[in-house]
Amino acid sequence: MRNFSRLLAASTTLLLAACYNSDTPLLTAAEADYPFAQRIEYTRTDVAGVQTQGTLRRDGDHYVLDQPGQDAETTLLFQQLEGEYYLVQETDTALGTANYDAVRITPDTVYLLGMRCSEIFDADAVIAGDFYAEDADFGLSCEAFDLEPIRAALKERMSSVLPQESYLILGTFP
């Protein structure tokens, strides 16, 4: 298990710009992996440079992201895609909706796949029957109904980019 003391994010929520989302969570606890310790204290720095303290803690079969000033609870599940790459499912428990993205966890740093959603949706990444919507800030987003096409698209995208070119640093380990 790894502990990290600082979590640096480029947005006010962990996966705000996730390209894939669903009305209900698609990843179950039985399919999840648990790459972090039971409790992690972090400092988040938003795009304006404002820092806040928070905690990522394991609560039974999922992680809970406790954020000061936020009433809604955010739960996280991780699933290893390959090697140090994980799919992340972020669920807003008040709404029941889920966002999906990918992280790379190395011995000393956690990276978030950072890109405009329109970059991931090309002819090879189209998910038949799913709904696409245009967002003014993040480009396209996809309402997904199955986890497998999300896994495949994220794996393809991760294999085609270098971390320093397309990933945001989320945290560092002491």
Task: Annotate each predicted stretch with a short phrase.
Residues 20-37, 45-51, 57-174:
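Calycin-type beta-barrel ligand-binding domains and close structural analogs
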Residues 15-18:
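C-terminal motif of bacterial Sec signal peptides marking the signal peptidase cleavage site
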Residues 1-8:
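Bacterial N-terminal signal peptides that target proteins for export
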